[in-house]
């Protein structure tokens, strides 16, 4: 039995170079280089323009591991080719963001401004004072940085003030009745 996700091959676009060395897979593209070690229960084969994940043995969880490995590899290929981005929106009076190089300065109603240093391979933009766009080649890192920024002031349930993802719906609670 083969995982439905792992059955689908990953197409390698032009301009992306994939190197398979045992369990270590390196993907190079215009946006950088990503390296990941895949679990030993999964075998990765490379043809001219495709990557295929196969179960290396018949252990109970190898189907799930093959599907996960395929999804991770597809994200690596897409990341170095087109990249990933997460958009955050700030809602609240006086909430502002400003990107300065590899730093993000936030004013979110605390007694002090919050300065965040971006990790290697991650860039941040602020098209307006209330919008933050986090970009990078590694989907996991981009999402983690966006989650760390949101965690500083998550949306509160009564007025909806805080930092939220662009597509996030905040369900507002009703205020206490007298």
From Swiss-Prot:
Query: Which controlled-vocabulary keywords does the entry list?
Result: Ribonucleoprotein, Ribosomal protein, RNA-binding, rRNA-binding
Taxonomic superkingdom: Bacteria
Q: Name one Pfam family in it.
A: Ribosomal_L6
Q: Name one GO cellular component term.
A: cytosolic large ribosomal subunit
GO BP terms: cytoplasmic translation
Tell me which InterPro entries the record gives: Ribosomal_uL6-like, Ribosomal_uL6-like_a/b-dom_sf, Ribosomal_uL6_a/b-dom, Ribosomal_uL6_bac-type, Ribosomal_uL6_CS
Q: Which GO terms describe its molecular function?
A: rRNA binding; structural constituent of ribosome
Keyword 4Fe-4S listed? The answer is: no
Cleavable signal peptide: none
State the family named in the UniProt similarity comment for this chain: Belongs to the universal ribosomal protein uL6 family.
Biological function: This protein binds to the 23S rRNA, and is important in its secondary structure. It is located near the subunit interface in the base of the L7/L12 stalk, and near the tRNA binding site of the peptidyltransferase center.
Record's PANTHER family? 60S/50S RIBOSOMAL PROTEIN L6/L9, LARGE RIBOSOMAL SUBUNIT PROTEIN UL6M
Entry's HAMAP family?
Ribosomal_uL6_B
Its quaternary structure?
Part of the 50S ribosomal subunit.
Q: What is this protein called?
A: Large ribosomal subunit protein uL6
The primary gene name is rplF
